[in-house]
C-alpha cells in the first residue's frame, strides 16, 4: 500500500506501508522509482537510511540491525556495498 504525498507522475515524496500497516519506505520517487534520500523499514523498524538512484541504494548509506544498532555505514553502488 502506498500513501503518496505531493506526487505528480511518479515524482515526489512517498510513504509505503506493508499489508499490516507498518511503514516500509519513506522518501522520494522520480519516475516511479526511489531516488534521492530515503529510509527503509522492516517490521516498522529502521533498517536502512541513505541515498537511492533508479530504485537502488546508491551513494552514502547506513544499515541497522533489528535492535537499532548501526551494522554498516559506507557507500553503495547499484544496490551493492562497496
Which residues fall in each region the model found?
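Glycine/tyrosine- and acidic-biased, solvent-exposed loop/turn segments at the edges of beta-strands
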Residues: 1-82
Amino acid at each position: 500500500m502506498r500513501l503518496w504525498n505531493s506526487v505528480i507522475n511518479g515524482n515526489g515524496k512517498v510513504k509505503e506501508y506493508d499489508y499490516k500497516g507498518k511503514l516500509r519506505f519513506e522518501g522520494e520517487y522520480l519516475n516511479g522509482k526511489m531516488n534521492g534520500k530515503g529510509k527503509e523499514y522492516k517490521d516498522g523498524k529502521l533498517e536502512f537510511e541513505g541515498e537511492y538512484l533508479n530504485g537502488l541504494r546508491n551513494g552514502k548509506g547506513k544499515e541497522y540491525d533489528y535492535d537499532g544498532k548501526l551494522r554498516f555505514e559506507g557507500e553503495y553502488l547499484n544496490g551493492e556495498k562497496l
